[in-house]
Every structure is written in C-alpha cells, then in structure tokens.
C-alpha cells in the first residue's frame, strides 16, 4: 500500500464555521425572545469512545449555537444520532429509533433530524435512508464533522434531505478545535483510522486509513485540558501502537506516553485500543516506568483459536498473545487486563471455543466486552462459509460470559480489606450519599465518607464489600 499523505484542514477553514454558529445562535435567541423557550437538542451516541469524543465536539458546537441539551426526544427541536457500524445490533437500534421519529416529525414538521457517524460512511445505508426514512433531514459522515454548523444551517433553510458524506480518500480533519466543556476526565485523539483490515471489521472503510496527530498538537491539547481542571486523560486510537508511523518525523507510541507523563497537573493517563500484533516491549516498559500511566491494559484478543485468528487476519497466535500478557504481568506488578471476545465467527468449532475459554482462564481478565459475531456488509467474513447458527452462537456466548463474570468476581473478592487509590469522580449513581471513582486498575469504587470537596482528588479507600462489577468501601483518613 502506498503511503498516504496526511491532510490537515487549515484553521482558517475551521474558523469559517463561526459565521454559521453565529447565524444559528442569532435565530435561536430570536426564538427565545419571541416564545420564552430555548431550542432543545437530543443527542444519542452509539459505539466506541471515538464516537463519544466526536459527540462531545458536536455538543460543544450546539451549545455555542444556543441549544440546550434535552433528555426527551418528544420535546426536542433537533435530534442527532451519532451511529456505529461495528455490529448489527447498533444499526438496528438506529433504524428503530428513526422509524419511531416519523410520527413525531408528522406532529412537528419544524423538528430537524440528523444522522452522522460510521453507519453513514456506507453507501447502502445512505441509500436505505433515502428510500425508507425520508423524514431524516441531514446525513453526514466521520470526516467532515467540522462542517456541522454549515450543514445544519443549510438543512434548517431547506425542506429536502441533505447528504454530505466524504469518501475515505477525501479531505480529512486533524485536530478540530472546539470550546468543549472540560470535565474531570477527557478523551484525546492521538490518531484516526485503521490499516489492519480484520476480515470481520468495517472500521477501515468508515474511519479511513491511519493518520497520526503530531505530538505537539496532542500535548498542547492536554495542557489546555489540564488548565481547565482535567485530571485524567485517555489517549484514543483504533490502534494506538501504530501511532506516529505516518508523521513526517515518526514518533513511537511509547515515546508519546513518556512525553504525556511529563505534563504537569495530570494525575492519570490511560490509553486504548492496543493491537496484540503491534504492542511493543517499549510500551510495556513505559507503563512500568511512568508514574501517571495506569496499570491497566485493554488488549483485544477476539478469540483464543490461532486458526480462527488467521481467518480474522489478526496476525498473531494464541501463544504469542499469552507471551505479551506474561511479559506485562512480569514488568508491571498488579496490572489489570480487559479484552474483546467475539463469539460465533464463521467456522468456529467447539475446539475453537475451548481455546477461547482457555485464554480467559489463563489471563484472568478483570473485564471483557463479550459479543456475538454479526455480518458486516462489505467485509470478507460476511461471505465466508460455515456461518454459525444463532442458537449455537448464543449458547457459546453464555458459556464465555459465565467464565468472564466468575473470574471478575474472584478478582474483586481479592480486594476485600485492601486500601486502594481512587480518583473521585462525583456522587455515586446508585446512592447520592456515597461517592464514586475508579482505581488505577479501572475498578469502579463506591464509598462512604467525605464531601463534594473530594471530587477531582485522589483518596484512599478501604474495600469492605467486593461485588462482581464494582467495589464498595469507606474513605480512609488521608
């Protein structure tokens, strides 16, 4: 594959969007002065942290336009779905939600409906929306997020469906700036796209090829976040271990981790996602050496069968994966692992499933995102023979899930009476009288004691009650 030239949108082009933001803001203010009501927007995000971060940018633009966030579809003037194409279930939810909106649109013709994200990068999806969901007003993809104010302005002034989806070889944006709402924890993109072409995956077709941001841009963004109160950074990429290869002056991911670790004011650094074929010893050493980088590694295996991994085009074996795990355990005491487990890939046998269960037992994951394989149009796996019947998929899924949950509970049981460091994120969602936060190993902890002054601080908590998916405890006097 020839090396692709990275294209960065000039800042002047991004700033051109300000006039559209101001135009909509002016219209929304006039509406408020006339009615006493604010324009409301409902957003829903499907999929990965990349999509979540894109939605943060959209919400920042919407706030600048004068919209207020709403939790109710029925009362909203603008509805936005940021979609995911990785699994069929997420797509079906989007289609179902859009179908339900047809009735609301009939009652309120001024309502605007926008759909964006990875689903929209697939031509057959756009064609489906054109034919069957004509009440949708605006469709745009993953590469032209910065143009949203302009697209929304055009849509508001038109009764026709507006479609603006760029091909992956078109102009792409690196480093979109927005007046985002800074929180305690923040995602920071370090790269975009993927070059791996796993046979089941649609991401290279929807997110494009790998492009890395410069270390300078990444570090400047993090410093800005820290200045506004952010304590924990998660570095994002489809495959962070490939970071830097497309830069004019290549920088490795391990080097970037060390640079980020040196930024003053950061308490914790996390990253995802790593690829087993690309993670280097240097990355493991960086986790070991860098005091702010958390002892936690999300390392998707997908399945434990080397023969299936070859069919998936993953470029590693079960044995190689386990070697990485052992090296990480040796170099980073107390490290926790999470993974992705795909059940029911075409041709999967009982022996293949036993290999997956064997990996689960040997690694002992703290958590695992376990899911059933679903066909993705345009991927090689969708055309493979020996597709697994749904009943067998579900039976195998339940067996793997039982093992994952049992091991997670066993690991958590080992936390009884231990004192752990917790970054306090706020009040517990389940009990307003308690506080919640996470350990360096990404364990959710709900604890008693303290007050709101603790939010954003590192505290010590004694674990009194381990649970399957969380830990309960009490604040230790610091």
From Swiss-Prot:
Entry-linked InterPro entries: Elp3/MiaA/NifB-like_rSAM, Methylthiotransferase, Methylthiotransferase_CS, Methylthiotransferase_N, Methylthiotransferase_N_sf, MiaB_methiolase, rSAM, rSAM_horseshoe
Entry keyword Nucleotidyltransferase: no
Domain TRAM residue range list: 410-477
Catalysed reaction equations from the record: N(6)-dimethylallyladenosine(37) in tRNA + (sulfur carrier)-SH + AH2 + 2 S-adenosyl-L-methionine = 2-methylsulfanyl-N(6)-dimethylallyladenosine(37) in tRNA + (sulfur carrier)-H + 5'-deoxyadenosine + L-methionine + A + S-adenosyl-L-homocysteine + 2 H(+)
Keywords: 4Fe-4S, Cytoplasm, Iron, Iron-sulfur, Metal-binding, S-adenosyl-L-methionine, Transferase, tRNA processing
EC number: 2.8.4.3
Family that this chain belongs to: Belongs to the methylthiotransferase family. MiaB subfamily.
Assembly information from the UniProt record: Monomer.
Name of the protein described by the UniProt record: tRNA-2-methylthio-N(6)-dimethylallyladenosine synthase
Taxonomic source organism: Clostridioides difficile (strain 630) (Peptoclostridium difficile)
């Amino acid at each position: 594959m020839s090396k692709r030239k990275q294209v960065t949108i000039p800042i002047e082009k991004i700033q051109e969007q300000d006039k559209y933001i101001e135009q909509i803001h002016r219209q929304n203010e006039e509406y408020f002065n006339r009615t006493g009501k604010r324009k409301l927007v409902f957003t829903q995000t499907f999929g990965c942290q990349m999509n979540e971060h894109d939605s943060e940018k959209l919400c920042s633009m919407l706030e600048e336009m004068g919209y207020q966030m709403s939790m109710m579809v029925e009362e909203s003037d603008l509805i936005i779905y940021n979609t995911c194409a990785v699994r069929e279930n997420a797509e079906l939810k989007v289609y179902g939600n859009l179908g339900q909106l047809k009735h609301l649109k009939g009652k309120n013709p001024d309502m605007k409906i926008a759909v964006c994200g990875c689903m929209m990068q697939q031509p057959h999806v756009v064609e489906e929306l054109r034919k069957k969901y004509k009440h949708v007003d605006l469709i745009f993809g993953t590469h032209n997020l910065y143009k949203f104010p302009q697209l929304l302005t055009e849509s508001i002034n038109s009764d026709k469906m507006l479609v603006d989806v760029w091909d992956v070889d078109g102009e792409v944006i690196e480093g979109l700036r927005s007046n985002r709402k800074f929180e305690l924890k923040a995602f920071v993109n370090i790269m975009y796209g993927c070059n791996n072409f796993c046979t089941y995956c649609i991401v290279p077709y929807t997110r494009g090829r790998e492009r890395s941001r410069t270390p300078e841009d990444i570090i400047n963004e993090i410093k800005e976040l820290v200045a506004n109160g952010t304590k924990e950074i998660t570095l994002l990429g489809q495959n962070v271990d490939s970071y830097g290869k497309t830069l004019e002056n290549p920088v490795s991911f391990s080097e970037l981790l060390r640079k980020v670790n040196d930024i003053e004011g950061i308490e914790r650094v996390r990253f995802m996602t790593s690829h087993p074929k690309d993670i280097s010893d240097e990355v493991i050493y960086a986790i070991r050496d860098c005091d702010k980088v958390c002892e936690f590694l999300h390392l998707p295996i997908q399945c434990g069968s080397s023969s299936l991994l070859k069919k998936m085009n993953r470029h590693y074996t079960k044995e190689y994966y386990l070697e990485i795990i052992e090296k990480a355990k040796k170099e980073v005491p107390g490290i926790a692992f999470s993974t992705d487990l795909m059940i029911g890939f075409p041709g999967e046998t009982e022996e293949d499933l036993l290999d997956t269960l064997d990996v689960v037992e040997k690694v002992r994951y703290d958590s695992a995102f376990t899911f059933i394989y679903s066909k993705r149009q345009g991927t090689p796996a969708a055309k493979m023979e020996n597709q697994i019947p749904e009943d067998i998929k579900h039976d195998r899924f339940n067996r793997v899930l039982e093992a994952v949950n049992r091991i997670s509970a066993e690991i958590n049981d080992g936390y009884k009476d231990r004192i752990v460091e917790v970054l306090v994120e706020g009040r517990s969602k389940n009990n307003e009288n308690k506080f919640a936060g996470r350990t360096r190993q990404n364990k959710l902890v709900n604890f008693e004691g303290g007050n709101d002054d603790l939010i954003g601080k590192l505290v010590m908590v004694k674990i009194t009650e381990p649970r399957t998916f969380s830990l309960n405890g009490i604040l230790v006097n610091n």
